[in-house]
A protein has these predicted regions:
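Patatin-like phospholipase
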Residues: 1-19, 30-237
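Catalytic nucleophile serine of serine hydrolases
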Residues: 23
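Active/ligand-binding-proximal structured segments within catalytic/core domains
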Residues: 26-28
Length: 237
């Protein structure tokens, strides 16, 4: 659903002065900014049929249940499965912001397009933003350990960044239905996180707090919508 929306926006020639993304949304950010509607489709539809995409075989090898290095780095190169148009991405005048979570420091970090000016730097950042704890191995960037940006203060709803930068009209794409409410983290997941990330307690804290942060973010977003400051897309189911 989200990939189809991104492809349609590109096909209609729609662009924005500021684009923020987190987790899977960071991949959408890249495809949208590079104006590649076909890659938007292929990344979220065809790629799952690739035997290198993931599975227990890759998980047992330490690559993650979703083979993150392949999905977010290897396929992007000219000889990869889905080459990325870096030149168009960089030429787009839009400001871009990708949310990640620095587990070493216990804080959110936003990366700009200027910090993703090569495929060697872009791939790890998008991978970090999308790295689901336990299911995917963490990413090292500049000596620090990174995981999914949804563990930050916005709970995975990155519309807070354009608001901080002064934007007052937003288009926001949500992946859950309008009436969705996130449930608290199960105790079993918490125990697993404490064990797997004992050296990074901020990961457990980020996941534990995400329910409240995410639900609060949705409430704020719908308030902005009521005030005419946000146009919100939600799936029917």
């Amino acid at each position: 659903y989200t990939a189809a929306l991104v492809s349609r926006l590109i096909a209609e020639g729609i662009n924005f002065p500021h684009i923020s993304g987190v987790s899977a949304g960071s991949s959408h950010l890249c495809n949208f900014t590079s104006r590649d509607a076909q890659r938007s489709h292929d990344t979220f539809v065809d790629l799952v049929e690739d035997p290198e995409f993931g599975g227990l075989k890759h998980f047992r090898k330490g690559h993650g249940y979703f083979n993150a290095e392949y999905i977010y780095q290897q396929i992007c190169y000219p000889d990869g499965a889905l080459p990325f148009n870096l030149d168009t991405f960089l030429a787009n005048p839009a400001i871009t912001r990708v949310a990640t979570f620095n587990a070493s420091r216990g804080e959110e970090r936003w990366f700009s397009k200027e910090e993703m000016s090569t495929l060697d730097t872009l791939g790890p950042i998008i991978r970090a933003s999308s790295t689901l704890p336990i299911l995917m191995p963490p990413v090292e960037i500049d000596g620090d350990t990174y995981v999914d940006g949804a563990l930050g203060p916005n709970g995975g709803l990155p519309f807070d960044q354009p608001l901080r930068e002064g934007y007052r009209k937003l288009l926001v794409v949500l992946t859950r239905p309008r009436d969705f409410v996130k449930d608290p983290m199960p105790a079993s997941v918490g125990a697993l996180l404490r064990t797997a990330y004992r050296s990074f307690p901020s990961v457990f804290e980020g996941v534990a707090l995400r329910t409240d942060r995410y639900n609060a973010g949705r409430r704020l977003l719908f308030e902005l919508e009521e005030r005419g400051q946000a146009y919100v897309f939600t799936p029917d189911n």
